[in-house]
Regions:
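Hinge/lid segment of periplasmic solute-binding proteins
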Residues: 513-534, 597-650, 671-675, 701
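Extracytoplasmic "Venus flytrap"/periplasmic binding protein-like
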Residues: 558-625, 632, 656-664
Length: 754
């Protein structure tokens, strides 16, 4: 199935148009007030950036809904009429059948337009498992040839799922409602990534999470332990287990690597979810405890939706806060009063899931994004009225051109101060939340500018353009709030009489002893060392991370060796520059991967590499690459290496800026030069990679210009450079040449060349 296509189930009889177009709808440029109504400042800005998430986001659109919320029974939406005008919550059945590791992404339009910004990108995740038998309590363990446990490869589960329309960044825990008028409505789905099978589409009232009214005591001695590295499934293939040599974790071995925690670096984005299988022997109420750490947000919690059997039991499990803990600590879920939260469970198999939630910080994120947009607007306006001359001794009164500019910035600072106060709700013991330090810096900076707004003439960079500007500090905070790195060692469900079975962290003396043991065992067998290999096997040295190497070795052992009968030993390459010395000493590997593009030439001229053209299938393999990529590895008529990766430069642009200035996206450097005056008069610019090299310009940066102009580096032979080609004349014209100058290309006009 081609990318972007979709199939519809035969049972589907709804008014849905499956569109595969990739057209981009132009974002509207709106004139925005510098402040919300009700604030003291009266000034407005006329130079504004457009930001559809702010102008047309769900928060703003849903606040203007006029229809009542639908409260009836679920409606299977078929070709026909919607029974009444109301706010509906839409869910649909789907099966993501593409082989891609990426989630399916789709845009959903109602009656030909997107009701709000979040409808442009809907993520339809797949489920991934590492267990051959998905519903077994015995997970699959994979070990390398050294006896170390390695990360197992996840398998995609091809199964039907159901999902409501939600924000792809999961700033809303609950689904998003849409207004539908009574009568015929058309739903259009555009696939932007992947393929799927689409089933029933259903309109419902807003799903309700039961209100928490307190918990009953968990009487009994039941105890259930779940190791967090043993997933049942997860909704992102990138979520994986990891090994930490921490005695507080289970399992732990001093000499071997064992998977004993969820890698925090892989589990931190809003909406990511991990699910575990558990078996309850005794029905009853259970408390839930987690052995976890999260040191990503200093003094601020990470929020989770804890689900039992796929549902949030009550509001105490929704957006539950997990406090900042740099070291692994045991935590039992408690309510706002500090009482333990219990959950009733029947005997049998159940699932427990943890989904990262962003809803508690949504309003803070929206406030910060709004202020950033307005600071951008003000920066444009200041540059418009004052130009780009940053003379400190230039007299200029901004109040005459932007009335209320000081009060405007003070109002933004007040809003940022409120953001900090809102954060303190989750950690009242702290006067200042360290994770929100950037907010305080930005607030103080705005207050400083507000006191003397005329200093903006030379302090304009402090608003939006420098690395220490207000907007940079706010952008840093957004990155911090979006990061929720969460490491999980284990989950426990227990009853009152089994509380003593909860493991405690090791004491300092035990940790010291285990540290000594770990130190001495490190002098033993060195896994993936070039000295610890079988000379009868193919030796491959890899200049990449250990995890990358482990996955390579796993794939080789499972696929390559059984198919070819060739045994392969991989080893970590400590220093790629030592390959030349290794060749001199006779200890060089058979194959080296991940090395810099310059290394093959150094080895080739020393006769240390085999000519790849001698292999019978070389021509077939070489056709997979662009010929230019092989050039650095050619010496004479021999080729000594093939590229493993390819880097290339792409252009990205700010569509909101171009829309505001009425400029088109440039296709040529001439068009870039033509738009530079419009950009630079507003303090903006166009970046080209040659700017990063102050002195000598490298071929990496300059050859794209040369080749795009029809030029060439060599004239038939590699030893004759010809940077004086017709391409230079085509670009600059004959009038650029003079008899008293020696310029590239001008020799083509001399009589001896005619």
């Amino acid at each position: 199935m081609k990318r972007g296509n979709a199939k519809k189930v035969m049972a589907l009889s709804i008014a849905v148009c499956m569109a595969v177009t990739t057209a981009v709808t132009a974002l509207p440029t709106m004139q925005l007030r510098a402040q919300e109504p009700g604030q003291t400042a009266q000034g407005t800005v006329t130079e504004t950036y457009s930001n559809e998430r702010l102008d047309n986001g769900y928060t703003k659109v849903s606040a203007g809904y006029t229809f009542a919320a639908y409260t009836g029974e679920p409606i299977l939406y078929r070709m026909g009429d919607v029974p009444q005008s109301a706010v509906y919550y839409m869910n649909f059945d789907y099966l993501a059948n593409s082989e891609s590791i990426l989630p399916v992404e789709a845009g959903i339009m109602v009656n030909g337009e997107y009701p709000f910004y979040e409808m442009r990108q809907q993520k339809l995740e797949s489920q991934w498992t590492s267990n051959p038998d998905q519903w077994t309590l015995a997970p699959r363990k994979v070990y390398d040839s050294y006896g170390n446990e390695v990360v197992s490869m996840p398998d995609k589960i091809y199964d039907w799922q159901n999902k409501y329309i939600q924000d792809s960044t999961y700033r809303y825990t609950q689904p998003l409602g849409i207004e539908l008028q009574q009568g015929r409505n058309t739903i259009t789905i555009e696939l932007n990534e992947g393929t799927l099978l689409l089933g029933n589409l259903t309109l419902t009232a807003k799903p309700q999470v039961p209100e928490y009214t307190g918990s009953e005591a968990a009487a009994g001695d039941g105890f259930i332990e779940i190791q967090a590295e043993d997933f049942l499934y997860r909704n992102d293939s990138g979520i994986h287990a990891a090994c930490e040599f921490d005695p507080d974790l289970y399992p732990y071995q001093a000499a071997k690597r064992v998977m004993n925690t969820v890698d925090a670096a892989s589990f931190g984005q809003g909406g990511q979810e991990i699910t575990y299988l558990m078996e309850v022997e005794k029905a009853g109420n259970y408390y839930i405890a987690f052995h976890y750490s999260q040191g990503d947000k200093a003094d601020f919690p990470v929020f989770m939706n804890v689900k039992i059997d796929g549902r949030i039991p009550n509001t105490a499990f929704e957006n539950h806060a997990f406090a900042y803990e740099k070291k692994y600590e045991m935590y039992t879920m408690v309510d706002g009063d500090g009482s333990k939260i219990s959950i009733p469970l029947e005997a049998g198999k159940h699932t427990i899931s943890m989904q990262i939630s962003m809803e508690p910080v949504r309003e803070s994120l929206e406030t910060i994004e709004k202020i950033m947009s307005r600071v951008n607007d003000l920066s444009l306006e200041v540059t418009k009225v004052a130009g780009t001359n940053k003379d400190k001794y230039r007299d200029f009164s901004f109040e005459a051109y932007i009335p209320g500019i000081g009060e405007m910035m003070t109002g933004w600072a007040d809003e940022l101060g409120q953001v900090m106060e809102d954060a303190r709700v989750y950690n009242p013991k702290k006067n200042k939340i360290a994770a929100y330090a950037s907010v305080k810096i930005a607030e103080n900076q705005l207050r400083s500018l507000a006191k003397k707004p005329d200093e903006l003439i030379y302090r304009i960079d402090e608003l939006a353009t420098s690395t220490s500007s207000v907007n940079q500090h706010l952008a840093n905070l957004i990155d911090s709030l979006n990061g929720n790195d969460f490491a999980l060692d284990s989950i426990y469900l227990y009853q009152e009489d089994a509380a003593k079975q909860l493991p405690k962290n090791k004491n300092i003396f035990t940790k010291m002893w285990l540290g000594i043991v770990r130190f001495f065992t490190s002098f033993g067998e060195q896994a993936y060392s070039s000295t610890n290999t079988n000379p009868e096997h193919l030796q491959v040295s890899v200049n990449r991370s250990r995890q990358h190497l482990e996955i390579m070795q796993l794939l080789i052992n499972e696929q390559f060796t059984p198919q070819t009968g060739i045994e392969v030993d991989l080893s970590l390459m400590p220093d790629q520059t030592k390959l030349v010395l290794a060749n001199a000493s006779g200890d060089s590997p058979d194959v080296a991967t991940g090395v810099n593009y310059s290394i093959p030439f150094e080895l080739g001229i020393r006769g240390a590499l085999k000519d790849l053209t001698e292999f019978p299938d070389f021509a077939e393999v070489a056709e997979r690459y662009n010929a230019g990529l092989i050039m650095p590895y050619v010496i004479g008529d021999r080729i000594y290496a093939l590229p493993e990766t390819m880097n290339f430069q792409v252009m990205f642009y700010r569509k909101d800026i171009l829309d505001k200035l009425g400029l088109e996206v440039p296709d040529t450097l001439e068009e870039v030069q033509a738009m530079l005056p419009d950009l630079q008069m507003r303090g903006l610019n166009f970046y080209y990679p040659t700017a990063r090299t102050v002195g000598m310009k490298t071929f990496l940066d300059t050859t794209p210009i040369l080749f795009q102009s029809g030029g060439t580096l060599y004239d038939g032979a590699i030893d004759k450079a010809i940077l004086t080609s017709e391409a230079w004349l085509l670009r600059h014209g004959q009038e650029a040449c003079h008899t008293d100058q020696v310029l590239p290309g001008c020799d083509l006009l001399r009589p001896e060349r005619v």
